[in-house]
């Protein structure tokens, strides 16, 4: 499914500038570039988008490339792992055939994680990984931070489309839906967040993001 004309107009005209230091599968290139157009801060960041069978409990995952963590932050690299298929109860669906808005929202959420990583030191990223593994409370807060980054950069409608797709899909397992409902922002939360951010100045929005990251660390520490 291709992007409609209005969506294409919203993509930065020079696609080549969005592709700098990026590796993107051709089949999802338009959706990835649309998501990247909302993150000018990542224009020079090395990010590799690739399909993998390694993901068992997620559709996508953003991870720093370990060997680059000893470099300066500007020289770090990240991977966004993508499951090639969307597993349903009785069938599978190629991920690139999911509705554009849904796929863009998924990618935008993972780019939100990279924005979070970019603000952390190497030790901070290691701590993030440990706490994410140990604490479900930390997972929820970390996912809220990623969604907040995306919403703050104008991706609210995409993030909402992704959440509604997951929670309303009749062929998705209830276990997966329960996990999403438990650990991630609900559609109502996203609508409320969009409304709040629209009322704030840019400086206030950035302060909200910083507060979200601090809350995630504080709550996780309290629960260890």
Q: Where on the chain are the PLM-derived regions?
A:
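Post-HEXXH active-site segment of zinc metalloproteases
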Residues: 101, 116-144
């Amino acid at each position: 499914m291709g992007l409609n004309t209005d969506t294409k107009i919203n993509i930065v005209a020079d696609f080549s500038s969005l592709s700098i230091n990026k590796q993107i599968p051709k089949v999802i290139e338009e959706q990835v570039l649309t998501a990247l157009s909302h993150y000018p801060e990542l224009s020079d960041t090395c990010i590799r988008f690739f399909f993998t069978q390694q993901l068992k409990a997620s559709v996508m995952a953003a991870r720093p490339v370990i060997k680059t963590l000893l470099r300066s932050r500007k020289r770090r690299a990240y991977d966004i792992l993508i499951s090639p298929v969307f597993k349903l109860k009785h069938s599978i669906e190629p991920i690139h055939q999911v509705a554009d808005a849904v796929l863009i929202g998924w990618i935008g959420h993972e780019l939100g994680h990279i924005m979070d990583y970019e603000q952390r030191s190497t030790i901070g990223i290691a701590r993030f990984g440990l706490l994410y593994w140990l604490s479900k409370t930390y997972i929820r807060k970390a996912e809220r931070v990623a969604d907040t980054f995306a919403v703050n950069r104008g991706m609210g409608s995409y993030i909402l489309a992704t959440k509604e797709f997951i929670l309303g899909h009749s062929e998705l397992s209830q276990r997966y839906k329960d996990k999403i409902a438990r650990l991630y922002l609900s559609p109502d939360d996203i609508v409320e967040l969009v409304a709040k951010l629209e009322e704030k100045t840019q400086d206030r929005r950035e302060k909200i993001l910083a507060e979200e990251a601090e809350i995630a660390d504080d709550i996780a520490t309290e629960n260890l």
